[in-house]
């Protein structure tokens, strides 16, 4: 498969999964929050999902397999904290350290998660949060 076809396939796969999560939960709220600069959380997580699937395809070519469904959902939900962390609200202090736990709590409110998806979400800030991932999809 050419890289162009693969990139288009991945983009469609990410868009489909994002639509499913938006219908079943609150993923569309992430369009309202800025992640970094002028990039929304939604744009950030869909970009991470595309990059993750692209990397997974390359790994697959050399015999390294991943749980693609968990990788995709985990990537889309890794920043599912659902608040504007730029707001000076005291509960947003130490956002970099705490948001994986908030993201996991919000995702568990809206979705049934696999243990691997939980690990992807809560461990994605390693080494800032010093507990390493326990599955390859979370790296």
Show which residues each predicted segment covers.
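Metal-dependent phosphohydrolase cores
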Residues: 1-139
């Amino acid at each position: 498969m050419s890289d162009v076809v693969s990139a288009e396939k991945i983009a469609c796969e990410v868009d489909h999964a994002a639509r499913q999560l938006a219908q079943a939960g609150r993923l569309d709220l992430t369009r309202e929050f800025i992640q970094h600069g002028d990039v929304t959380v939604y744009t950030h997580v869909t970009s991470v999902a595309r990059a993750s699937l692209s990397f997974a395809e390359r790994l697959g070519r050399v015999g390294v397999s991943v749980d693609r469904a968990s990788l995709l959902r985990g990537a889309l939900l890794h920043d599912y904290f659902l608040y504007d962390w730029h707001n000076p609200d005291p509960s947003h202090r130490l956002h970099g350290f705490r948001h994986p736990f908030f993201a996991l709590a919000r995702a568990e409110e809206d979705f049934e998660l696999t243990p691997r998806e939980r690990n992807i979400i809560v461990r994605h800030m390693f080494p800032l949060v010093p507990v390493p991932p326990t599955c390859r999809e979370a790296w």
